[in-house]
């Protein structure tokens, strides 16, 4: 049975009390589903508004399930599973807990009504707790009424043919000043010698473009080509070129790296997407000073010093100021803001192409068996794309701003990413890219992770 079948049942007779909410429950097979079954066999009663979907473990409940449920007409969603320490798969609920912490903060940033999204630990012996939880959620949503704003979004299936692109308060244009000054002699010499000696077989850097008014990312393989390098002033992130499977086979690989590229390389190393031993870093400080040819560990030590500890690294002060201004607004205003921004999206995927972290073999938007979300640039398609992309980058985005600079619709993507980075730091003390030997945020957990929002 599919999610759509569960939350689109046969028409029910009109309720004598008026509005009857539709609630979708994603539950663990071993605990909560058994608890709900116990409630039934014990002849306990609770509202029939809930449609229950059983999955093997809460660790299997993807955030896309929650998004899909809301877009398919649910007025409320609840996720429930085993208590910590009782998971039949050892740590599935621990991983789920970290995932839901991040998702709640993302939904709050977007202005989604968090009162409609509950999480609970319910064991197989807690049939009474299941009844109480469903009764409480149903009563709460009845008071809130239908989720009209989400229903309107889900019904918006007509893409805007000519989206209106205007300057926004929260949008900040990344530097694209067209600087094509030649690279420093020290950098050119170091790259040339590395290619001559075999310390690097290919070097990724910035070169002058004959057609663009700004540097372009390129890779060179001969010592003579090193003279074509220019100062690394482009707004993109050179680490994204490492997504190229052909380039990644040419090892050892050199890269002209600023702090944003070093952070990105560390994240890729954490995820075993690159081998630090095969990477040669031509370190360039953010002020343009060449720091020498070093390995990734040394580059991390020398270039990531004196970073602020009170906010995520990589993001500018202006981005966090914009985020703070947004979060000071009521949820309804935040929702309207992001709906206006999302409506401008033309689904060109320039944000995906410019991001060194977006490297899946097949993006969820390209999957059509099944097709979970609309591919058109319509209301639900754009909303799901930006929400899930931001979530997938939680704990991974280094704040380089390449996505925002590449966006032709001028959507403030870095603000969403900053919200996720702040959530990762606040709840888990995680800073993306500081340690190449660290653990990826969403693949890790701690038994004492926050759970005060779980029933």
Predicted regions, residues:
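Iron-sulfur-associated redox domains of electron-transfer enzymes in respiratory
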Residues: 1-344, 353-356
């Amino acid at each position: 049975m599919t999610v759509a079948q569960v939350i689109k049942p046969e028409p029910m007779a009109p309720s004598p009390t008026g509005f009857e909410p539709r609630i979708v429950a994603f539950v663990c097979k071993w605990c909560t589903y058994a608890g709900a079954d116990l409630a039934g066999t014990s002849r306990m009663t609770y509202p029939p508004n809930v449609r229950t979907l059983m999955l093997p473990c809460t660790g299997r409940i993807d955030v896309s399930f929650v998004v899909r449920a809301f877009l398919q007409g649910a007025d409320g969603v609840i996720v429930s599973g085993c208590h910590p320490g009782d998971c039949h798969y050892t740590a599935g609920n621990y991983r789920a807990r970290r995932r839901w912490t991040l998702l709640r903060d993302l939904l709050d940033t977007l202005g989604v009504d968090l009162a409609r999204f509950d999480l609970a630990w319910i064991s197989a012996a807690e049939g009474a707790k299941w009844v109480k939880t469903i009764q409480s959620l149903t009563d709460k949503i009845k008071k809130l009424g239908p989720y009209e704003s989400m229903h309107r979004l889900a019904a918006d299936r007509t893409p805007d043919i000519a989206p209106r692109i205007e300057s926004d308060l929260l949008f900040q244009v990344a530097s694209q000043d067209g600087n094509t000054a030649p690279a420093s002699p020290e950098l050119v010499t170091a790259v040339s010698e590395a290619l001559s000696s075999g310390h690097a077989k290919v070097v990724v850097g910035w070169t002058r473009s004959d057609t663009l008014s700004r540097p372009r990312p390129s890779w060179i393989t001969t010592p003579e080509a090193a003279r074509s390098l220019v100062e690394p002033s482009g707004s993109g992130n050179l680490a994204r070129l490492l997504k190229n499977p052909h380039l990644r086979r040419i090892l050892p690989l050199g890269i002209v790296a600023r702090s944003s590229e070093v952070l990105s390389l560390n994240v890729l190393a954490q995820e075993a997407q690159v081998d630090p031993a095969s990477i040669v870093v031509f370190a360039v400080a953010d002020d343009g000073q060449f720091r020498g040819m070093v390995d990734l560990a040394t580059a991390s030590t020398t270039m990531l010093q004196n970073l602020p500890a009170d906010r995520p690294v990589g993001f500018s002060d202006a981005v966090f100021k914009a985020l703070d201004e947004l979060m000071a607004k009521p949820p309804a205003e935040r929702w309207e803001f992001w709906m206006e921004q999302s409506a401008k999206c033309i689904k060109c995927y320039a944000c995906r192409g410019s991001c060194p972290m977006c490297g899946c073999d097949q993006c969820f938007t390209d999957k059509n068996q099944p097709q979970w979300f609309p591919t058109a640039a319509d209301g639900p398609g754009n909303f799901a794309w930006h929400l899930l992309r931001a979530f997938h980058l939680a704990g991974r985005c280094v704040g380089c701003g390449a996505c925002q600079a590449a966006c032709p619709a001028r959507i403030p993507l870095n603000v969403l990413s900053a919200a996720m980075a702040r959530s990762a730091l606040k709840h888990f003390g995680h800073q993306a890219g500081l340690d190449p030997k660290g653990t990826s945020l969403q693949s890790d957990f701690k038994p004492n992770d926050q759970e005060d929002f779980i029933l």
